[in-house]
Regions:
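Patatin-like phospholipase
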Residues: 3-251
């Protein structure tokens, strides 16, 4: 969503775009799982490192880029930074619009990377999407290392930072495939929880979205997620206006 927002899409365009592609990106076909298991049983090997082809993500982003006349990072109306993790070095990697001249231990800053590759890398959820190979890197979801990357923006000199994330304490174990995915996601939450809490304190304002009515990779939860996000923002409206100001007193 950060990428399509940076493309200059309006809220209605983002809603339409999300609803159009949600099923493509989120649906997990049980047949693919059984096929992978059958291949493993017969050949004693797994051909892919994910259930879904990560190229699907890149294709969706390229459609959005075509729609808004965007060729890459530097065509975006605003600067964009995207986080991912390299499985080979276990280092965090940050795609940026321009070279910010930053240096930090175990963080690689990358520029001139195709926008669709950067988004695919950042969304390559372990075991669900295939990893993203690019140059000497093998990328997976950035949330596996830093699920609320506030420090990155502070390092880049951003004056005030609003951190928005889902309420990670809202977790209910489940059974079946949905339960399996939730456990994997929960494990990532556990690994990154200390960093998330530090990021919340570092931000000028941190807002958590209560998402009791949504589930990871649920196909029909776009409208509910949008509403929950809207409710969370409006609940902090006064704080937002006080900290970040507004150009319109009626906003």
């Amino acid at each position: 969503m950060a990428a399509i927002c940076a493309m200059g899409m309006t809220p209605n365009e983002m809603r339409y775009f999300a609803k159009k592609h949600w099923k493509t990106l989120a649906e997990i076909d049980n047949g693919l799982i059984f096929k992978a298991l059958a291949t493993f049983i017969i050949n004693k090997k797994v051909d892919k490192d994910g259930i879904k082809d990560g190229q699907l993500i890149a294709d969706v982003i390229k459609e959005g880029m075509l729609l808004k006349g965007i060729r890459g990072f530097r065509d975006l109306p605003i600067n964009l930074s995207i986080c991912t993790v390299d499985t080979l070095t276990t280092d965090e990697c940050i795609f940026t619009t321009y070279d910010e001249g930053l240096q930090n231990d175990h963080i690689h800053y990358l520029t001139d990377v195709p926008l669709e590759v950067a988004v695919r890398a950042s969304m390559s959820f372990p075991a669900i999407y295939t990893t993203c190979d690019y140059g000497n890197y093998n990328f997976i979801d950035g949330g596996s290392k830093d699920n609320l990357p506030v420090k990155i923006l502070k390092d880049m000199g951003v004056g005030k930072v609003l951190a928005i994330g889902f309420d990670i304490m809202a977790y209910n174990p489940d059974a079946g495939l949905d339960g399996l995915i939730k456990v994997i996601w929960r494990a990532l939450d556990v690994y990154s929880i200390d960093g998330t809490r530090k990021s919340q304190k570092m931000a000028d304002l941190a807002i958590e979205i209560k998402n009791e009515n949504t589930q990871l990779f649920a196909i029909d939860s776009v409208d509910e997620t949008i509403q929950e996000g809207y409710d969370a923002i409006m609940a902090h409206r006064d704080e937002l206006l006080k900290i970040f100001g507004t150009q319109n007193d009626n906003a």
